[in-house]
UniProtKB/Swiss-Prot annotation:
GO terms for molecular function: ATP binding; DNA binding; type I site-specific deoxyribonuclease activity. The gene is hsdR. PANTHER family: ATP-DEPENDENT HELICASE IRC3-RELATED, TYPE I RESTRICTION ENZYME ECOKI R PROTEIN. Belongs to the HsdR family. CDD domains: DEXHc_RE_I_III_res, SF2_C_EcoAI-like. The restriction (R) subunit of a type I restriction enzyme that recognizes 5'-GAGN(7)ATGC-3' and cleaves a random distance away. Subunit R is required for both nuclease and ATPase activities, but not for modification. After locating a non-methylated recognition site, the enzyme complex serves as a molecular motor that translocates DNA in an ATP-dependent manner until a collision occurs that triggers cleavage. Residues 568-591 are annotated as: Disordered. Type I restriction and modification enzymes are complex, multifunctional systems which require ATP, S-adenosyl methionine and magnesium as cofactors and, in addition to their endonucleolytic and methylase activities, are potent DNA-dependent ATPases. Its EC number is 3.1.21.3. This is Type I restriction enzyme EcoEI endonuclease subunit. Coiled coil: none annotated. GO terms for biological process: DNA restriction-modification system. ATP binds at residues 195-201. It catalyses: Endonucleolytic cleavage of DNA to give random double-stranded fragments with terminal 5'-phosphates, ATP is simultaneously hydrolyzed.
Length: 813
């Protein structure tokens, strides 16, 4: 463009005036092949106390497609004042998310072309007029992928598009495309690993839709092990199949339909007459998709496995959040290595899954154990075996009524501190335990239960009334039930978008099961304020975080006694809300095994509706005792440092070591200088939080209500501590205000009072002038203009006031 000085143009101008014209001139269709400002991530949710916000994320400037949802290339633009290659690294990051081999960086002068299909010359500079055509990139892409001519009709098949604008997320697109690619290449066993809450069923639908529409697969079976999974799938994601789809009922497979949704239990069973799958020939289905395939399809002795073996010629796609790999069960042995994996950690980092905090509650009998006196009878007259009972026994072989009530009381107290209407799932050891927990919660919440008898419901496989409320529990628009007690039924497939509290009072040894249970809370619902959740752990299940197989660590781990939650005057909320992030831990991981527990689900017994019961109540003999004095333990606080290590030392020692090893805080003088030089002290406070300094925990150890500045001067540098009130008194003694006119003195004096009450963060924000008693003096802009002249003068006065506040007493030589 003659006469245009590119160096004065913005990045947007460069895209509009130079890059897009070059791309269009090369033959790319603006409607179907070019997308601008493509947002690939949602932005990680960061929890700050009780509030949560998203980190802002950048979007890819331009993505080029062969056709919608089949991406080929990324173009990253920069203003002309930058080098032509400036955007390359950013573009490569987007390209890895989209699984594309081509990246173009440009500042409007030309392009740097990164071409993974050409290892001999990975990067080259090309002119604007030499931008590749769609056909050129598609041919190179197909060669890079190794596609044959026969595969092209399948891999080019359109996605389903309902016209609403809904499109797959980048990882769903990768999972769909890689699976379709694998099927088109003739692969018959495929595994997809996607974290709970990331849209596995929608992903499965698009895979099936494309293969079905391409006539590559004509008869499809979708297998699940829970009625709710099948019903949700039919009603929601699979709805576009319309009259071509059916749910298998009455143990009858109707060959008139092309897409069949079935419970495993509805088409097989221990008796020959229950094996409905044999009604059709072994080659009837040519595609089988197995939802939650970790639950048994890969187990050699599984009843479900016989279905897969009968239809052995069909392509079989396993979907799971948690592939099972034990001596007895291996998804990978059966399906092969996953064609794509999207982990819990990635989901949280990308902002598609909710982060969480953990509160561990220690009860004395859990830690110390309990032993009956010799010959002691339980409350039903059974003699209790004389041995020490511990955490693994409680609610499994030994029931202590007082422990049940203490757990229920702690749950109740937590909800009262937060919100009694927060959706809560309580995972219990078995149906009996879930029933007793429901009763205890009803007894402790009479005011809520009187408002609505469905405030607490037991939702287990044996209870038709409870199961009938499952849809209401997971419906964000329904307030009741609020608390669901369960054992196995809700561990998988329950889309509880608004669940804000997950309670673990169940012995969990399986990493697979643990991940599934955590997944009940990871869904996000911004409309209803669900951006993060809390795990309340009574059975040390969250020690599985230490297992290397676990990813997606909690924001915070807090170990407390029940009294910390029930005591209104305790600092439980402040500790839980302290703004630190956790990335790891050093707990003993000896519990992280996939061993089969002594007490397990009896898969031989089925409910009348074709679903397995949660457990077999006659499997283990239980003793029921009461009158046990159940106490709480001394409080232990664990916290994560900036390196993600779980710290148990004195927090004062940790703070001192952390500060002194940082050169900016290595001496009192350097700390004071940095503090005084900072235009806003809040910036320093937040910076120190990133180093792992927890102000609430530190203040509790010191035992005084000190300003962050004085906490550090005292703990790290050995200075005598001054309270905020003492600092205010010192400022007033020095007659500092006489340099200002009376109207300004009035404002500064009031700011000083605000500092004494609230701290330095309060007075640094100009919005403080909207609060009482400033509101009686006029609007903020009037206060600043009439009493200080302008905003700059006001900010300077506040800064000088802070310097007066933080003057150190003279040090002796």
């Amino acid at each position: 463009m003659a006469g245009v000085n590119k160096t004065h143009l913005t990045e947007t101008d460069i895209i509009t005036k130079f890059i897009l014209p070059a791309v269009k001139d090369a033959g790319w269709d603006v409607m179907s092949q070019i997308r601008q400002e493509v947002k690939l991530r949602d932005g990680k949710i960061v929890v700050r106390g009780k509030l949560a916000s998203r980190i802002k994320v950048k979007s890819a400037d331009i993505v080029l497609y062969h056709k919608p949802n089949l991406p080929l290339a990324v173009i990253e633009a920069k203003a002309n004042k930058h080098a032509i290659s400036k955007g390359m690294q950013q573009g490569l990051d987007y390209a890895s998310l989209l699984d594309v081999p081509f990246v173009f960086a440009s500042n409007g002068d030309g392009f740097i072309f990164h071409d993974k299909t050409n290892p001999q010359q990975l990067e080259s500079e090309i002119a604007l007029s030499d931008f590749p055509t769609p056909e050129q990139l598609w041919q190179k892409y197909c060669a890079w992928k190794g596609f044959t001519q026969e595969q092209l009709p399948v891999i080019s098949q359109d996605y389903f598009d309902d016209g609403s604008g809904k499109a797959p997320r980048y990882y769903q697109m990768q999972a769909i495309n890689r699976t379709v690619d694998a099927v088109s290449a003739g692969k018959n066993r495929i595994l997809l690993v996607m974290a709970t809450g990331t849209g596995k069923t929608y992903t499965a639908f698009q895979i099936i839709w494309r293969l079905w529409k391409a006539k590559n697969k004509k008869r499809i079976l979708f297998l699940a092990d829970r009625n709710i999974l099948v019903d949700q799938t039919k009603r929601n994601d699979f709805q576009p199949f319309g009259n071509a789809m059916t749910k298998v009922t009455g143990r009858t497979i109707d060959p008139a339909y092309e897409v069949h949704l079935a419970l495993y239990q509805a088409i097989t069973g221990p008796e020959e007459h229950q094996k409905a799958y044999k009604q059709v020939a072994p080659d009837f289905f040519d595609l089988i998709v197995i939802d939650e395939c970790h639950r048994g399809s890969a187990s050699e002795d599984s009843a479900w496995r016989e279905i897969l073996e009968y239809f052995g010629s069909a392509t079989q796609v396993g979907l799971t959040a948690t592939p099972k790999e034990t001596e007895d069960v291996s998804n990978i042995d059966y399906f092969g290595e996953p064609v794509y994996t999207y982990s819990l950690k990635e989901g949280i980092e990308d902002g598609f899954l909710a982060p969480y905090k953990v509160v561990r509650v220690d009860i004395d009998v859990d830690v110390q154990g309990w032993r009956p006196v010799k010959g002691q009878l339980d409350k039903y007259g059974e003699e209790i075996e004389d041995r020490i009972y511990n955490l693994k026994d409680f609610d499994r072989t030994l029931v202590i009524d007082e422990r049940t009530m203490l757990v229920a009381q702690t749950i109740t107290d937590y909800l009262k501190r937060t919100n009694p209407m927060d959706k809560t799932i309580v995972f219990c050891n078995d149906i009996d335990h879930a029933d007793r927990m429901r009763h205890a919660l009803v007894v402790l919440n009479p005011e809520q239960v009187l408002k609505n008898e469905k405030y607490v419901m037991k939702i287990t496989g044996d209870d038709d009334i409870g199961k009938a409320q499952l849809d209401n529990f997971i419906n964000p628009k329904k307030a009741y039930p609020v608390i669901a007690t369960t054992s196995e039924l809700m561990t998988t497939g329950v889309d509880a978008q608004t669940c804000k509290l997950v309670v673990l009072d169940q012995n969990i040894q399986s990493m697979t099961k643990f991940k599934q249970i955590i997944g009940r809370g990871t869904r996000i619902n911004e409309k209803h304020g669900k951006l993060w959740f809390t795990i309340l752990d009574f059975k040390k299940a969250t020690e599985l975080f230490a297992d290397p197989r676990f990813d997606g660590l909690p924001e915070k781990v807090l170990v407390v006694k029940p009294g910390d939650i029930s005591d209104k005057d305790s600092d439980f909320n402040e500790q839980l809300d302290a703004e630190n992030n956790a990335d790891g831990g050093d707990n003993d991981a000896s519990e992280a095994r996939e061993d089969v527990a002594d007490y397990q689900v009896n898969r031989d017994k089925q409910a009348g509706n074709g679903e397995f019961h949660d457990d077999d109540e006659n499997k283990v003999r239980k003793f029921y005792v009461n009158g046990v004095d159940v106490k709480v333990l001394a409080k232990r606080v664990q916290y994560y440092d900036s390196d993600g290590k779980l710290v148990t030392e004195s927090f004062q020692d940790y703070t001192r070591k952390t500060m002194l090893k940082d050169s900016e805080y290595a001496s009192l003088d350097s700390f004071v200088r940095k503090w005084q030089d900072a235009p806003r002290k809040q910036v320093i406070i937040e910076e120190l939080e990133q180093l792992g300094i927890l102000w609430d925990v530190l203040a509790e150890e010191v035992g005084k209500d000190l300003d962050p500045f004085d906490l550090l001067c005292h703990v790290v540098y050995g200075q005598p501590p001054l309270t905020r009130q003492e600092r205010v008194a010192n400022v007033r003694k020095r007659n500092y205000f006489t340099k200002y006119a009376e109207p300004a003195q009035q404002v500064l004096n009031t700011l000083l009072d605000k500092y004494a009450d609230e701290g330095v963060q309060e007075i640094e924000d100009v919005q403080v002038l909207k609060l009482k008693p400033f509101d009686t003096l006029g609007r903020p802009i009037e206060i600043i203009k009439t009493r200080f002249g302008d905003k700059k003068a006001y900010e300077q006065a506040v800064n000088e006031l802070e310097n007066e506040i933080y003057q150190l007493p003279p040090r002796s030589a």
